[in-house]
């Protein structure tokens, strides 16, 4: 990624996800004027665990889904795919109409409990997800036009809104 970029890349870290997405909600609220310029959110949550398999979760549209599947196949990144709302820091962005790709590994046990400890992390698994993310960012950044629409399918947008603002 040591090159001049076609698009602005912004890396943010959000705190207090487990307490209700407090950091990502605060970021979205503090940057309302800039949100229309954000084309995509990549969210990394539980990507480096030894147990499980890679998973990419698209909160967006089928164009994004096809794009990431093609790239994964092209570079040999073995992963599962799903289209759903990632219950993580990308959700407040998706609620504002910003598509998201969630990077994670499924199959880990003990998350969000006293058993949520760092020893089951794998540098190899984290590197695999990072290599795919770098390839994705490079591919998008090298495109003459942004490669997919900045949209979230209506049914998915409704699911996001219900997650962000639950009706108790």
Where are these regions (language model features)?
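His/Asp/Glu-rich mid-to-C-terminal helical/loop segments that flank catalytic regions of hydrolases
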Residues: 1, 7, 109-168
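Alpha-helical metal-binding/catalytic segments enriched in His/Glu/Asp
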Residues: 1-22, 133
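A short, structured beta-strand-centered segment in the mid-to-C-terminal lobe
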Residues: 5-6, 33, 43, 128
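Noncatalytic linker/hinge segments flanking ATPase motor cores
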Residues: 8-9, 50-58, 79-88, 122-126, ...
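Metal-dependent peptidase/peptidase-like ectodomains
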Residues: 14-108
């Amino acid at each position: 990624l040591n090159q001049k970029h076609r698009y602005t890349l912004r890396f943010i870290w959000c705190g207090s996800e487990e307490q209700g997405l407090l950091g990502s909600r605060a970021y979205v609220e503090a940057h309302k004027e800039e949100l229309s310029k954000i084309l995509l959110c990549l969210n990394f949550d539980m990507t480096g665990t030894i147990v499980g398999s890679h998973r990419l979760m698209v909160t967006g549209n089928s164009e994004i889904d096809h794009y990431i599947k093609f790239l994964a196949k092209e570079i040999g990144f073995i992963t599962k795919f799903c289209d759903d709302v990632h219950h993580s820091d990308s959700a407040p962005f998706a609620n504002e109409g910003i598509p998201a790709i969630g990077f994670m590994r499924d199959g880990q046990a003990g998350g969000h409990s006293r058993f949520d400890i760092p020893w089951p992390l794998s540098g190899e698994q984290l590197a695999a997800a990072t290599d795919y993310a770098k390839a994705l960012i490079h591919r998008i950044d090298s495109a003459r036009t942004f490669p997919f629409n900045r949209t979230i399918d209506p049914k998915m947008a409704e699911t996001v809104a219900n997650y962000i603002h639950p009706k108790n």
